[in-house]
């Protein structure tokens, strides 16, 4: 069960994951131990999965983003497909989807040659019968945080 204080803590941490318990405590007018305990519980519940740095992929040299639609031969291969996707460093996201495909991957690579090499590898994964790629030309919104205002009506994430 999340209360308003938990939601405020999560909002602060989503804006800046390096915010200290002391800084959060000051902004919410609570004690440092109270904030630390709440963060610990949010982590134990799995609401906070991890803390990480958000990189600028273009400045890091990954200039090309693509969405790769996967058509799989049979659902027997899904587990191995997901395992391969999880092991592939170029795969940023992997989702099971409805429609003509079975999965969609969001991938980031250096250039078109790297994408071609990656697609060759993916097409050789067990069960993959076809891929279709769509290149991202421009990105106007990429969000890593959840809009916690929607939680004002639903406080239970269990």
Predicted regions and their residues:
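A compositional/biophysical signature of low hydrophobicity enriched in polar/charged and small residues
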Residues: 1-158
């Amino acid at each position: 069960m999340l209360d308003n204080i938990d939601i405020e803590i999560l909002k602060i941490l989503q804006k800046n994951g390096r915010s200290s318990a002391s800084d959060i405590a000051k902004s919410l007018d609570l004690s440092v131990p109270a904030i630390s305990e709440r963060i610990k519980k949010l982590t134990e519940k799995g609401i906070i999965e991890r803390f990480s740095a958000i990189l600028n992929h273009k400045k890091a040299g990954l200039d090309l983003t693509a969405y790769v639609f996967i058509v799989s031969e049979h659902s027997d291969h899904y587990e191995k497909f997901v395992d391969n996707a999880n092991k592939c460093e170029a795969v940023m996201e992997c989702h099971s989807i409805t429609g003509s495909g079975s999965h969609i991957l969001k991938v980031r690579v250096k250039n078109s040659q790297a994408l071609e090499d990656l697609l060759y590898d993916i097409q050789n994964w067990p069960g993959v019968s076809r891929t279709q790629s769509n290149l991202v030309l421009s990105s106007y919104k990429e969000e890593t945080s959840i809009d916690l205002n929607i939680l004002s009506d639903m406080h239970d994430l269990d």
